[in-house]
Amino acid sequence: MGWNGGLTSPSMEEHFYPFLMERSPSYMGEDEEEHGDEDLSLVLERKDKDLLLAAELGKALLERNDQLMKAKDALEEELRETLEMIEQEKHNMRLKMEVQESEWRAQVADLESDLAEARLQMQQLLSEQRECGRESASAVQELSEQNQRLVEQLAQASQVEQAITLEMKSLKEENRDLTISRGQFAPCLQSLRSENALLLEKKKEMESQTKQLQEENDNVQNQLISAKEGVFQLQRQKEDAKSQVLQLELEAQKLRDSQRTLQLQLKELQDELHMRDSQFSMRGTHSSLHSEIQQSTAVQNHEKGRNSAETQSITSGYMDTYLTEREGDLLRENEEQTVRLQDQVTMQHIEITDLRKEVQRLKDLLQQNNADSTVKQAVLDRDEALMKKAELEQELARCQIEKESLNLQLLSTIQQKVMLSQELEAWQDDMQIVINQQLQSQKQQETQKPPESPQNSFLRRDSKRGKILSFFKNI
């Protein structure tokens, strides 16, 4: 094989196998050094072998190059398929990201609306909290005033107790003085001991009574607090009921407006029916239908006037709560008004049933006469409006009954609170009057009596001590 069958040029052979070009001089140098007398045939034979070896190596390199080109084409094809798959996945991911972005935007909008609602609720809660804080501050102020009065009463009781302890100390000193003459005053000493024991027992009783009074006062304060909470709740319920009544009145006004429009349409339809009665032979049937419509319109106007009068009488029945002697009369009037409202509700039930019967009868007449579809629709609309109006009036009456019952509960709670406060004030006034009278009588007795002997003064102290103990025992 020559150069054209193997390698393309010597430069290519030198590029791939440079060791061949380096090998020939080495062989030649060795041959010159070792075998200087070797002939030219051996050198040519060696060169031929080297050329054959180089040709075989070139052939192997070409085969390897073909394999590498095929592998390169396969890798390029695989790379192209991989790039197409990557582009497809990128497109799918882009679509998914757009869908997710739209979903995220919707979620963000929902979250923003929820955040706005939460802010509104937070503002409402803050306003309610401020209102509760003001109410609790007023309640705390009232309770602090009551506690101050109780502290003053306890201070007075402690002063009396200190006076008794001072008298007991003086008695002990006198007892020590009298131990010298025990033989002479033995019966008096015995009586003093018994009186001392009685004083100690009465002191214990007085302490127990003061504890009972404190417990009763605490119970009264707890009842007052619970009553105030009930009053606040009833006031809130009353405000809710008022707002519901206003909403019902607005709805009733809307229904009245729609009723006026329906009456105008009905009047126009009646004129058309009157025009058609002159053209057709069904005068008797249409005249009966006309009279039925007029009767139902008159009944509707009568019910409208009566219901408006009832609504005015109900709305004018709001009473102001006064803590006076007229509370019992107000309660009785509220009960009577509740009974009247219940009777009105039953009457409205009966009227609704009558209206439904009238509607059914008019429907039957319309089906028998085969009148115009516009007339049917107008009558049906009017009947539906009447039924809705009756239902709204019934709901309004029910709300009025609930409101009156809440007013009754509020008045009863206020009465209980007033009675408890009056009893507490009366008890405090009685205690103050009795204490003042006792102190004045003691001062008058001390100023009127002349100075006495030590024995008489001792007996006077015993009598004074007995009066004070009898006073606390009576309390």
From Swiss-Prot:
Q: Could you tell me which InterPro entries the record lists for this protein?
A: Spindly/BICDR_Dynein_Adapter (IPR051149)
**Listed Polar residues bias regions:** 286-300, 308-318
Keywords in alphabetical order, please.
Coiled coil
- Hey, what's the signal peptide range on this chain? none
**Does Transmembrane count among this protein's keywords?**
no
For whether the record's keyword set contains Coiled coil, the answer is: yes
Q: List the disulfide bonds.
A: none
Which stretches are annotated as coiled coil?
56-275, 340-413
State where composition is biased (Low complexity).
440-450
Query: Region Disordered: start and end of each range?
Result: 286-318, 440-459
Annotated family: Belongs to the BICDR family.
Q: What is this protein called?
A: BICD family-like cargo adapter 2
Point out the gene that encodes the protein: bicdl2
